[in-house]
Design a protein with these regions (language model features):
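Conserved DHp (HisKA) dimerization/phosphotransfer helix of two-component histidine kinases, i.e.
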Residues: 1-52
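Conserved catalytic submotifs in the C-terminal HATPase_c
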Residues: 54-64
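Conserved ATP-binding N-box helix of the HATPase_c
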Residues: 69-90
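Short beta-strand/loop element within the Bergerat-fold HATPase_c
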Residues: 92-104
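Glycine-rich/acidic phosphate-handling loop/turn and adjacent ATP-lid/helix
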Residues: 111-136
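Glycine-rich phosphate-binding loop
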Residues: 137-146
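Detector for a conserved hydrophobic position within an alpha-helical segment of the HATPase_c
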Residues: 151-152
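Conserved glycine-rich
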Residues: 156-157
């Protein structure tokens, strides 16, 4: 069992390194790209690395919403990585991403069928967005803080966090032009 955990951690480190290399190669490009295309590429990457992870995407945007690919990757890669790290014991991890809105702003509903938030965050779930807050023993508490600041960088905001039955976060991404 310990060997399985060590192997899983090694894969996670490799994937995180790959993600960071992708971002640094582009020097954090802020030019807008279609969110629909970005989110599908992100989901495919994670599902190809983890056969037990299923990412279901539903997009209902009246007009194309555009965002920096790097900002979108930071947000969604961190959310998916957190879900994976919290739920390595699951046979199947289902992640649902629902995106709806217009070309000016979208609402994103991200949820997984995992363990949810740690007990310390159930009454005050927004605390998880603060720097160095984590429910994992080996967590550093930066992932959700980075997600939150990336959302705010595009005039967005986190509206709902619930960790009772799996993890759920609903947030708005604003105008990026």
């Amino acid at each position: 069992m310990l060997e399985d955990i060590q192997e899983a951690n090694g894969v996670l480190v490799e994937l995180a390194t790959s993600m960071l290399e992708d971002i640094s190669k582009k020097s954090f490009d802020k030019s807008p790209t279609s969110l629909n295309g970005i989110i599908n590429r992100i989901a495919e990457k994670w599902m190809s690395e983890y056969s037990w992870v299923k990412v279901n995407i539903s997009v209902n945007i009246l007009e194309e919403y555009r965002i920096s690919e790097d900002i979108a990757r930071v947000i969604f890669d961190n959310l998916i990585l957190n879900s994976i790290q919290q739920n390595t014991h699951k046979d199947i991890l289902d992640i649902d991403i629902v995106i709806k809105g217009t070309s000016d702003a979208v609402t994103v509903i991200y949820r997984d069928n995992g363990v949810g938030l740690g007990r310390a965050y159930l009454k005050e779930p927004f605390r998880i967005l603060e720097v160095h807050e984590t429910s994992r023993d080996d967590g550093h508490g930066l992932g959700m803080w980075i997600v939150h600041n990336s959302i705010r960088s595009v005039q967005g905001g986190v509206e709902i966090i619930d960790g009772n039955k799996g993890f759920l976060i609903e947030f708005r991404l604003g105008e990026t032009r």
